[in-house]
């Protein structure tokens, strides 16, 4: 056996060893736990499963979760686009500081985020006198901490970087030549964006929105500090925690049933992401070939 054959044999062995390690890791760390959640949710039968997922508290938690997710995705899509555009198309003092601040939700403990919002908008917070003045003047009953607005704010904070961080590399790779040429030919800002910029970033934007949605649906830490009323401000992850901590067999099974909702949503999001990646890759290959 010559050296080339030995090398090919070692390469083949290495390949199968790495494949085996990867498959086993994914199976034991991801597939098996998720399968256990689904199987545990059906432990007491389909009747109990549907009764659990349609209970008053679970339905309320799902509504709060979806509401906070939709608001967070809409706001973060807009401001994510703005932040990505500013940091890639303009030069200004503090640009690096802004780019660093965008990444703060990735590096800070989410429990601290919740406490920070609580100390800002709660009864002991510096912004609470403004809320109290507004309520007294307009006869309103606006609340942020321990209310839906607090849940929404925490979700927005946690999910802010996802859209901008997907778009920024694409805008950096795109450069400014096409946009500057269009501007010299008299095209306006909106026309340049929708005709030149948007077609090149749309897949990154959609991917960022999917990641933002997925992260918002599963948020627990920051929201936990700002939500206290079950059936009113609890999100689905908080409701799952409350059911599980009840300790009874039926409530634990109900917790797994509620968890299966998030598992199903996660699988749908994953499939959608892979479809979009495939379409983007295929379109890129077609453009390269032409």
What are these model-predicted stretches?
Residues 3-10, 48, 71-102, 115, ...:
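Transmembrane-helix boundary motif in ABC transporter permease subunits
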């Amino acid at each position: 056996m010559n050296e080339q054959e030995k090398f090919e044999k070692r390469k083949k062995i290495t390949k199968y060893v790495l494949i085996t390690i990867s498959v086993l890791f994914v199976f034991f760390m991801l597939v098996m736990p998720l399968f256990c959640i689904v199987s545990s949710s059906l432990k007491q039968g389909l009747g109990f499963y549907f009764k659990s997922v349609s209970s008053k508290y679970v339905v309320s938690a799902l509504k709060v979760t979806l509401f906070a997710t939709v608001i967070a995705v809409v706001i973060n899509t807009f401001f994510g686009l703005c932040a990505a555009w500013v940091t890639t198309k303009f030069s200004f003092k503090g640009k690096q500081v802004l780019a660093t601040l965008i990444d703060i939700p990735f590096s800070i403990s989410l429990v601290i985020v919740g406490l920070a919002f609580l100390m800002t908008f709660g009864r002991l917070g510096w912004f609470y006198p403004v809320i109290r003045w507004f309520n007294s003047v307009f006869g309103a009953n606006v609340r942020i901490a321990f209310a839906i607005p607090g849940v929404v704010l925490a979700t927005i904070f946690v999910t802010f970087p996802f859209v901008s961080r997907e778009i920024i590399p694409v805008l950096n790779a795109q450069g400014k030549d096409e946009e500057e040429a269009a501007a010299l030919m008299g095209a306006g800002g909106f026309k340049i964006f929708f005709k030149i910029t948007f077609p090149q970033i749309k897949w990154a934007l959609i991917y960022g929105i999917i990641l933002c949605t997925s992260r918002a649906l599963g948020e627990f830490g920051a929201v936990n500090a700002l939500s206290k009323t079950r059936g009113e401000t609890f999100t689905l992850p908080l409701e799952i925690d409350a059911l599980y901590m009840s300790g009874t067999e039926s409530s634990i099974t109900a917790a797994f049933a509620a968890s299966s909702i998030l598992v199903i949503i996660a699988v749908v999001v994953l499939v959608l992401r892979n479809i979009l990646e495939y379409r983007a890759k295929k379109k890129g290959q077609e453009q390269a070939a032409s």
